[in-house]
Regions:
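Surface-exposed, glycine-biased beta-strand/turn segments
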Residues: 1-40, 68-69, 93-96
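Short, solvent-exposed beta-strand edge segments and adjacent coil->beta transition regions
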Residues: 8-10, 48, 81
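A generic structural motif
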Residues: 17, 33-36, 57-60, 77, ...
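Periplasm/extracytoplasmic soluble domains of Gram-negative envelope assemblies
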Residues: 17-18, 47-48, 79
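Zn2+-dependent peptidoglycan hydrolase active-site motif and core
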Residues: 24-57, 83
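Conserved, short, structured surface segments that act as functional micro-motifs
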Residues: 42-43, 65-101
Length: 101
C-alpha cells in the first residue's frame, strides 16, 4: 500500500521483484528515461496532468504509446520502491487524494 514519502513528491509503494507496474489512468507515455540508479522513470500524460512512475526496473512500453488504465507499463526490480508523482499544469497533486489504489 502507498505511504507518504517526505523526501520526494508523491508516494512510495513497496514492490516485489517482477511486480507489474500499471497505468493508473488512460494516457500517452510521453517520456521514458534512465535514472542514475539504473532504473527508469516513465511519464504518462493525461490531459493537463502527468503521472510519473519512478524506479521501474524494466519498461514494457515505448515512448509515444497510448495506454489504458490498468495496462502494464513496467516491472519492478525488487531492489527499489516505486515512486508515483502526480502533477497538474506543473503543480504537485497528492496521488493519494486522486488515485484509487
Amino acid at each position: 500500500s502507498p505511504r507518504p514519502d517526505h523526501h520526494v513528491y508523491g508516494v512510495t509503494v513497496h514492490a516485489a521483484k517482477n511486480e507489474t507496474v500499471v497505468a493508473t489512468t488512460r494516457g500517452t507515455l510521453v517520456s521514458v528515461e534512465r535514472l542514475m540508479d539504473d532504473t527508469y522513470a516513465v511519464t504518462l500524460q493525461h490531459g493537463n496532468m502527468v503521472t510519473s512512475y519512478r524506479h521501474i526496473g524494466h519498461v514494457l512500453k515505448q515512448q509515444g504509446t497510448k495506454v489504458e488504465a490498468g495496462e502494464s507499463i513496467g516491472l519492478m526490480d525488487g531492489e527499489h520502491d516505486l515512486v508515483v508523482e502526480l502533477w497538474d499544469a506543473g503543480q504537485f497533486v497528492n496521488p493519494e487524494e486522486v488515485i484509487v489504489w
